[in-house]
Amino acid sequence: MNIWLSMLTTTGLGAIIGGFTNHLAIKMLFRPHRPMYIGKFQVPFTPGLIPKRRDELAVQLGKMVVEHLLTPEGIGKKLTNEEFQKGLIHWAQVEVDKVMTNEQSLRHMLEKWDVAHVEKEATEKIEQVIIEKIEAFLEEYYTYTWEQALPHSVHEKIENAIPNVSAFILKRATHFFESEEGKSRLSKMIDDFFASRGALLNLVGMFLGNVSVVDRVQPEVIKFLGQDGTKQLLTDVLQKEWEKLKGRDVKELETFVEKEMIASSILSAVQVEETVGKFLNQSVQQVCEPVRETIIEKVVPGAVTKGLEWGAKNVESILNNLHLAEIVQQEVSTFSTERLEDLVLSITKNELKMITYLGALLGGMIGIVQGLLLLFLK
């Protein structure tokens, strides 16, 4: 009975000592958190291993992440993985579609993004661009003649239109002189003509008798305006003037209208501020609807694919520029010892328990061996 009691005692003590020793060793990895002193002498094994080597641990963790976890090869494979690309494209399409189907106005969206002065800035920028383009256009065309400046099609249209213009002028002139206003104006012109020629008026009056001069002249004027020869004469005159104009410099226009006035007139016609305002008052959905399908189905997949291809080719330089090792090192260095302990224990808690149990098991087995040795020795 005493023999079995001795074996049980040695086994129990061995298990307790083995388990406690391993448990203590595990605790000493983290504790104490700070060095302990007796007088001026530092107590051995203080602080614990991990608090003491925290800076080295941070450096090694950073190296481990870069050299073994987030490697260029691993990230490159992920970026070129077909399933990953499909998932990313689908996600991008959903997110872009959410933005493009937003019913809020562009103005509201920009204000939400703290872009408050976009309307004023856009108006000023567009007006500036228009003015610059107009000035550049005029600067170039002022070196040309009208024949050089106008396209060949315009030349043809003007030359083909000259006979029609002649006919229109003569038609309007005929209608004018047939009217009472035209007759009155013609009468005044005749009176003014003869006013300084009194003797001539008396002579004409002797030939015409009681018929007024204007009654004789008006039909002749109308008859003259209706003749084909008159139309051809006016056409020839207009054609000659057109030929003269073609040889003149465009720059002569500046004597009548300044560049600034031309630019100002065009800006007034375009109404940039009003146009920009109307555009910003539209909803995002209204603006994007014409191109929504193209962007979702073509632009987004193409952009994501190109972006991933570029990322896969340049992943090494991207990682180098990110300095991931330094980021991990800095983050770990900022951890308190308690947080670092909790972090390690949350990962290795079960394994550390098994080590404690293993120590107790080994201690118990050693106790059994000791008990057997004592038994045989007796």
Curated annotation (Swiss-Prot):
<dbReference type="GO" id="GO:0005886">
    <property type="term" value="C:plasma membrane"/>
</dbReference>
<feature type="transmembrane region" description="Helical">
    <location>
        <begin position="1"/>
        <end position="21"/>
    </location>
</feature>
<keyword id="KW-0472">Membrane</keyword>
<dbReference type="InterPro" id="IPR007383">
    <property type="entry name" value="DUF445"/>
</dbReference>
<keyword id="KW-0812">Transmembrane</keyword>
<feature type="transmembrane region" description="Helical">
    <location>
        <begin position="357"/>
        <end position="377"/>
    </location>
</feature>
<comment type="similarity">
    <text>Belongs to the UPF0754 family.</text>
</comment>
<keyword id="KW-1003">Cell membrane</keyword>
<dbReference type="InterPro" id="IPR016991">
    <property type="entry name" value="UCP032178"/>
</dbReference>
<dbReference type="Pfam" id="PF04286">
    <property type="entry name" value="DUF445"/>
</dbReference>
<protein>
    <recommendedName>
        <fullName>UPF0754 membrane protein BALH_0780</fullName>
    </recommendedName>
</protein>
<keyword id="KW-1133">Transmembrane helix</keyword>
